[in-house]
């Protein structure tokens, strides 16, 4: 049987191990709960779907790394990590309900995997929050997930250019003029936020660089 696209990724085994350890830690009855591995394999296969160029396995690796980096700010780091796994698990570039469908997937899969109702609800809430990336003051779990998801904006000029190019490839079916207008609107919306990054670390380390990167991209789009 040929290897799946996900299994060919160099971080596949590490990702699956991370998932299994995370779920076992969160299961209410770990001795009788299902094996987490099939759920993780399904998620990894989703993240490796061919329509993905930015929202890919590399993205989930990066977001999980950032949530670990910011873990001290979270009230429930495990809920944040689970939300990172699910936040774009359902992804179709031509649809607008990806976050909602991803949250619904979490609401189905996590109870089956032995995760309790309260934590499942928190994971789904966090996934839905990635629509706006605008958590309320005091939403510590939300700030960590949103900061981790937006950290790509603070990359080096080369890394940011690669990110922007990957986003464009995901929307390759959209005509240039329409893409430029839509992308510019998203950038303006993000730049209008009083703070992109709500954790102290994210604000201190990433805010200025991210705003500079986005402003540069916006200038190019509107040139």
Question: Can you describe what each PLM-predicted range is?
Answer:
Residues 27-46, 59:
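Short alpha-helical hairpin
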Residues 78, 95-98, 119, 137:
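Secondary-structure capping and boundary motifs in well-ordered enzyme cores
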Residues 2-29, 48-55, 66-75, 86, ...:
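Divalent metal-dependent phosphate-bond-processing catalytic cores, especially two-metal-ion Mg2+/Mn2+ enzymes
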Residues 35-39, 75-82, 114-127:
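Acidic/histidine metal-binding catalytic segments
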Residues 16-20, 37-41, 64, 79, ...:
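An amphipathic alpha-helix signature
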Residues 46, 102-136, 188:
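Histidine- and acidic-residue-rich, metal-dependent catalytic cores
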């Amino acid at each position: 049987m040929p290897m799946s696209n996900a299994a060919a990724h160099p971080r596949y085994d590490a990702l699956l191990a991370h998932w299994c350890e995370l779920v076992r830690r969160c299961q209410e009855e770990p001795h009788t709960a299902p094996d987490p591995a099939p759920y993780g394999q399904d998620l990894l296969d989703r993240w490796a779907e061919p329509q993905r160029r930015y929202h890919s396995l590399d993205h989930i690796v990066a977001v999980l790394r950032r949530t670990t980096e910011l873990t001290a700010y979270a009230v429930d780091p495990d809920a944040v990590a689970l939300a990172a796994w699910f936040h774009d698990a359902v992804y179709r570039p031509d649809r607008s309900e990806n976050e909602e469908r991803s949250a619904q997937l979490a609401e189905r899969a996590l109870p089956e995997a032995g995760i309790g109702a309260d934590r499942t609800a928190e994971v789904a809430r966090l996934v839905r929050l990635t629509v706006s990336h605008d958590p309320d003051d005091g939403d510590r779990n939300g700030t960590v997930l949103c900061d981790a998801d937006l950290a790509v904006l603070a990359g080096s000029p080369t890394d940011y250019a690669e990110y922007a190019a990957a986003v464009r490839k995901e929307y390759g079916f959209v005509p240039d003029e329409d893409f430029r207008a839509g992308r510019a609107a998203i950038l303006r919306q993000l730049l209008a936020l009083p703070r992109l990054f709500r954790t102290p670390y994210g604000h201190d380390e990433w805010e200025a660089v991210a705003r500079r990167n986005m402003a540069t991209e916006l200038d190019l789009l509107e040139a």
